[in-house]
A protein has these predicted regions:
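Divalent metal-dependent phosphoesterase catalytic cores across multiple superfamilies
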Residues: 1-179
Length: 179
């Protein structure tokens, strides 16, 4: 475990960055090498939830942030705040990464869990990019549940969170019957 940290700056070179620390919790679930949830540390690695809040940002301003993970700072990621008095959210329903498991691919093969997650994550990325291009003044993203098809498959959550666009927006999710 390590203390979660984020730093925020006005320039990509991170000069003058302000650092914020947060909290980290360990969940009672562990992730196996196959990306599924298991019940003990002997069967897999611990799952950590890190939370950091950055304060003092101004509206209509472009910032860059980095997160600290495994002893290193990430690449600088850009985000732009919008008008604080007027909000625009995009609402998505059922991204459900992994839902095409068991369906046939374009090559005629039955899709396994990993292939289905990859396929659905690709389509989710296209959907997200298209929606954001059509709505450039979006403040945050919302989903109405079912981010994944199976809550025990970490790789499905990774597919949901993978699009680059997810790094620059606040996200609010609702738990669906598959989550």
């Amino acid at each position: 475990q390590e203390t979660p940290k984020v730093r925020v700056a006005l320039s990509k070179d991170m000069k003058g960055a302000v650092e914020f620390t947060g909290t980290q919790d360990t969940t009672p679930k562990y992730i196996s090498e196959q990306g599924t949830t298991v019940s003990s540390a002997e069967e897999g690695e611990a799952y950590y939830a890190s939370k950091v809040s950055a304060e003092g940002v101004e509206e209509n301003t472009t910032y860059y942030y980095q997160y600290f993970q495994n002893g290193e700072w990430s690449e600088a990621i850009e985000f732009t705040t919008q008008d604080f008095d007027s909000y625009k959210a995009l609402l998505f329903g059922d991204p459900q990464i992994g839902a095409c498991k068991g369906q046939q691919s374009s090559e005629g093969d039955t899709m396994s869990g990993y292939l289905a997650a990859r396929n659905d994550a690709f389509n989710w990325n296209i959907t997200l990019e298209t929606a954001l291009a059509a709505n450039p003044d979006t403040n945050f993203l919302m989903t109405a549940g079912d981010q994944v098809n199976s809550s025990s498959n970490e790789y499905e959550y990774a597919g949901f969170l993978n699009p680059d666009a997810m790094q620059g927006y606040a996200l609010s999710t609702t738990i669906g019957n598959h989550d």
